[in-house]
């Protein structure tokens, strides 16, 4: 197994729900800076936080977060 990176589409999903970073942060109990860092890929959330975010955004975990291999392919392709 090669190097993998956790990717996300939080910004897109927040827009669908008309949520700001601050509103999502409050809903899951973190700071706006934490949401910003997750969106930018600078911080990988705990499983508990990722599940909480997915629940608030009303999507399966895999729709909000996924692993991407070093070669750019999504895990499982």
Where are these regions (language model features)?
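DNA major-groove recognition helix of helix-turn-helix/homeodomain DNA-binding modules
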Residues: 48-63
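Short, conserved catalytic or interaction motifs in soluble domains
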Residues: 40, 59, 69
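Residue-level signal for the short linker/turn that defines the boundary of a DNA-recognition helix
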Residues: 8, 18-19, 45-48
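Short alpha-helical DNA-recognition segment
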Residues: 18-37
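Short, charged recognition helix plus adjacent turn
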Residues: 65-77
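A short, Lys/Arg-rich alpha-helix, primarily the initiator
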Residues: 1-16
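Alpha-helical residues within the helix-turn-helix
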Residues: 15, 26, 55
């Amino acid at each position: 197994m090669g190097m993998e990176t956790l990717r996300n589409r939080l910004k897109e999903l927040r827009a669908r729900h008309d949520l700001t970073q601050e509103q999502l942060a409050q809903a899951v109990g973190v700071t706006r800076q934490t949401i910003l860092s997750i969106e930018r890929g600078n911080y990988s959330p705990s499983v508990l936080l990722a599940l909480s975010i997915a629940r608030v955004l009303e999507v399966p975990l895999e729709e909000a977060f996924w692993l991407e291999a070093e070669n750019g392919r999504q895990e499982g392709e």
